[in-house]
Amino acid sequence: MIPDMRSLVLLLAVLAAPAFAGSEPSRLTAAAQDQVGVTVIYDPAYAKLAFPGGDVPRDRGVCTDVVIRALRDGWGIDLQLVVNHDMKADFAAYPALWGLTKTDRNIDHRRVPNLQTLFARIGAEVPLDEGPVPYLPGDIITWKLPGNLDHIGIVSDRLTVEGTPLILHNIGRGAQEEDILFAYPMTGHYRIGKDQAKRLKALQ
């Protein structure tokens, strides 16, 4: 991103913030921040989970677990349950990337492409091709990492000294709050407002 465009994005965030201010985004970011120092291991191993409300031990996880735990702790939304119910209702709407013919409640919600699909289906997608948009606390961003790896994180309410929003994520060192918003090519931007949150809760 060129410097002028980056500055414009940050200005838009400042101007738009009051319209989206409220307890909901702050609860989400706080729940993600609470994971820093607790989740200290990146562990992508497949695990059999309880259902609903299943999780691997809190000291470990992957990038999606930051989002899953934040929505569960901050908003009472169980993405394990939501993804399972939505995939059962329309399995063909979800990416066919893993050779599966039915849902797997242990892993479906822990895959970035599935979360991207879910967020788009509930109307949370913020288009990437319509010019600069603000990045607000609680927004969810996806990226493509080197090696064609998918990544996901949550926009923090904290900024760098230059004014860039920090990102809450787990990229290999446990949950961290870091300046990586513009570090990798973005593949998705999602904002879960009240309407989208209601749709998620209705799927539980």
Model-derived segments and spans:
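Aromatic- and glycine-rich peptidoglycan recognition patches
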Residues: 122-137, 142-204
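Generic serine detector
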Residues: 7, 23-26, 156
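N-terminal capping segments
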Residues: 20-120, 124
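Bacterial N-terminal signal peptides
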Residues: 7-18
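N-terminal secretory signal peptides that target proteins for export/translocation
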Residues: 1-5
